[in-house]
Amino acid sequence: MKIWIDADACPRVVKEIVSRASERLKVPVCLVANTDLSRAHTSLVTSVRVKAGFDVADDYIAENAEACDLVITADIPLAARVVEKGGVALDPRGELYTEENVGERLSYRNLMAELRTDGMLLGGPAQLGLTDRNRFASALDRLLTKMVREHRPQ
């Protein structure tokens, strides 16, 4: 079991929350980005630097994450790929992507992108607030506790 973080756009506070949970539960983490994240390394946290380019980090995660892994991402197309493979994906606001909701979230994302392209909508999602951080930390704790119980040998 491993935690993968789509680290290019992941808020620093989310990476810190994941790092603390990783240390507590002894679950390895891999940050994937097109920038150097080696200073974030600990005994359980590593990073992979990919080439700059559209969806390169997403492709790396989708190809390397396994069904027993957790992927932290705000990228809905990546989450859809992970869920399709049988993996688990969580967004930085603590919302779990599931087979039941990922298609709807992908459609909504595409609609919003189209509205922004047409100039009918400005900006993106709101900045991560304290409520979002707390929701993420709680969701991560519940999810990791369950996953560790299921995937660690007794």
Swiss-Prot record:
It holds the Pfam family DUF188. CDD domains: PIN_YqxD-like. InterPro entries: UPF0178. It comes from the Bacteria. Belongs to the UPF0178 family. NCBIfam families: PRK00124.1 (NF001095). This is UPF0178 protein GM21_2006.
